[in-house]
Amino acid sequence: MVRKNKINRASGTTKHLKDFPSVILSLPSYNPSILSKNATALITGGSSGLGFELAKELSRRINKVIVADIQSFPTFAQVEYNNIFYYQCDITSLDEIKNLKKAIERDHGNINIIINNAGVAHIKKLEHMTNKEVEQLIDINLIGAYRIISTFAEDMIDNREGFIINIASVLGELTPARLTSYGASKGAMIGFHKCMSRHFRSLSTECNKTGIKTLLVCPGKIKTNMFIDVPTPSKLLAPDIIPSQLALAIISAMEHNHLQTLNAPYYVNLVPFFKTLSWPYRHLLKHFSGMDHVTSTSPRAINPKRSA
C-alpha cells in the first residue's frame, strides 16, 4: 500500500563543503543542469540520514521532492517543508513500486531525478547469517534499486532526459569483518551502476533516445544510525562524513553535470591502489587501520537498520 503525506517547507542556509575534492565542486558545466529546470526527484530511504538531507536540500532547488520509504517521514519536518511529499513504500515489492509510480503520476507527473539511497546492514559473521537475512539485504540494497530504475526510467527514456544517482559505499570495494553481505551488495551496486551507465550512453549515441545522466556515490562511513555503534578507527585518516555535507557535494556534482563517481572523503580515492596490493599487505592494512576490529567488536543488534 502506498500512503502519501505532504510535508511543509522551510528555507535553508549555505553549509561549507569540506572534506570533498574541490575539483568536483568547481567543474565547468557545458550543459544546463537538470536542477535548473522544473524537476521532480524521487528519493528512496529519504526519511532519515543522507536521504533526508538530500530531500531537504533538493527541495530548495527544484519543484518537488518525493520521498519513498517504509519508515515514516520525521514528524518535526512535517511543518517545515511544503514541496516534499512522502509515500510509504516497500521497495522489496514490485507491486508497491508500480502503485507508487501510478500515485506519483496522478499527483505530480513524471519523475526527472532518481536517487537510490535506501539500504540496510547486518554486522554478523557470514556463517551466522540466515538465508532470509541475506535475501532481504540484497533485495533492498541492490534489487530494490533495480526495480525503481526499471519502473521509472522508461519515462526518462521517452522524454530524453533524467538523472539517476546510486548510493553505493567504499565497503563495496574494501570490506571489513562481519560485513561480508553488506559489502557484497554494495559491490554489486557498483557493478550494476557501471553497466547501467554504459547502457544509457549507448542509447544516447546509437539511437539518440536518451539524455539520462548517471552518478555513482561511493562514500566512506557516514555519521548516521546505520553504523552509529561502530566507532571510527581513525578520525584523521578516515573521518566520518556529515550527511548534510555529502548531500551538498552530491547536489554540486549534479549542478556541474559530474557524471562519473563521487568518492568521499579523500581516502576513498586511494582504495583502488589498496586493491592492487597482494593479500598479505591488504591484511596488514586492515589490521593497522583498525577497520576489522571496530566492526567485529560492535554491539550491533541482529535486526537490520534502514537508510544510509
UniProtKB/Swiss-Prot annotation:
Extract the InterPro entries matched here.
NAD(P)-bd_dom_sf, Sc_DH/Rdtase_CS, SDR_fam
EC number per UniProt:
1.-.-.-
Q: Which UniProt keywords apply?
A: NADP, Oxidoreductase
Task: Check the record and name the Gene3D superfamilies matching this protein.
Answer: NAD(P)-binding Rossmann-like Domain
Q: Does the keyword NADP apply?
A: yes
The record's section on CDD domains has: 17beta-HSDXI-like_SDR_c (cd05339)
- For NADP(+), which residues are the binding ones? L50, D90, N117, Y182, K186, I222, T224
Extract one GO molecular function annotation from the record: oxidoreductase activity, acting on the CH-OH group of donors, NAD or NADP as acceptor
**Top-rank EC class of the record's enzyme:** oxidoreductase
Name the coiled-coil region(s). Answer: none
Q: Name one Pfam family in it.
A: adh_short
Catalytic residues at Y182, K186
What family is it from? Belongs to the short-chain dehydrogenases/reductases (SDR) family.
Quote the protein name from its UniProt record.
Uncharacterized oxidoreductase YDL114W
Q: Which organism is it from?
A: Saccharomyces cerevisiae (strain ATCC 204508 / S288c) (Baker's yeast)
